[in-house]
Amino acid sequence: KSLPEAPLWDGKMRGILDKYKENNTPQLIIILGQEAWASYISQEYKPDIPVLCGMISKNAILLPDSDLNVAEWEPKYIDIQEYVDKGLHLGGFLYSYDVKENIRLIRKLYPQTQNIALITDNTYGGLAMQTLVKKEMENIKDLNLILLDGRKNNIYTIVEQIKNLPDQTVILIGTWRVDVNDGYYVGN
């Protein structure tokens, strides 16, 4: 799903959790995917039962309010370990993206690199990835971060931006499925 639909996810998750309160409380919640995970952690009420996750990232962001312009939204980075430390019973498989190690490899292969261009799409996963990379790049003063952001661009403007990148630039591809116009690009 595209990021502009994110405010709807919160209400859907709230409805599911409310449906299974009291006598209907499950013994385990299974969450698959970034969007479902974001919907769950964005809830004020989270039942005190174990959660099993799949296809989610260790890095996350909370969902925006419904009246927010997602193209301009600058969310705060959240490490899922913080939730575990606060007592959330969490298990499963988390993707962990090591931005520092990617930068180290880039510097080893291309020591003259001056710019990192990050491509992200108009999805929750794309914005969560962008938030993580921006956080990690705050500590890397000698490289410039260039954002090729699918929340603000379609595939054609991204291609033009790639053509016009400065010399000594390496591209990191975060994710690309959905552009600003909700155009899907899968398997091409």
PLM segments and residue spans:
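Short hydrophobic alpha-helices and adjacent helix-cap/hinge residues
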Residues: K1-N188
